[in-house]
Amino acid sequence: MRRGLILLALAPLLMGQGGLPRPRCDFGAGVEALRDAARLAALPPPGLLEGRARGEEMSTRLRAAIPVFIGCGCATLAGHTAEAAGLAANMTGATAAAQISSMQEQARMRISMAQGHMDRQGCR
């Protein structure tokens, strides 16, 4: 009982440490959106119309994660996610299938960088 009270009293201090999300934020939803976008980016490059649709879907998922990460106090992670969302959104304006392939690879790399940042530094 006493140990539980001590942990409860220290929880706000522990959550304030760098690398941890703020309490009561939906960090898991942001992580899941990032994973979903990574799965889409890892698929083989589609044709032009399918590529535009995939870019829109990736961008939508990534943009949904940005306010979650900001609300959790993860500004750097939100920034990396925003860059990935911008690259995915570029796919919607592609004029050739070859552009889709290149743009998807750029978005995939940026998503991978965001995930790597999250794995190495947590919520920052």
What would you call each of these model-derived segments?
Residues 6-14:
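Bacterial N-terminal signal peptides
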Residues 1-4:
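Positively charged n-region of N-terminal signal peptides that target proteins for export
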Residues 19-124:
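Mature extracytoplasmic or organellar-lumen-exposed domains after removal of signal/transit peptides
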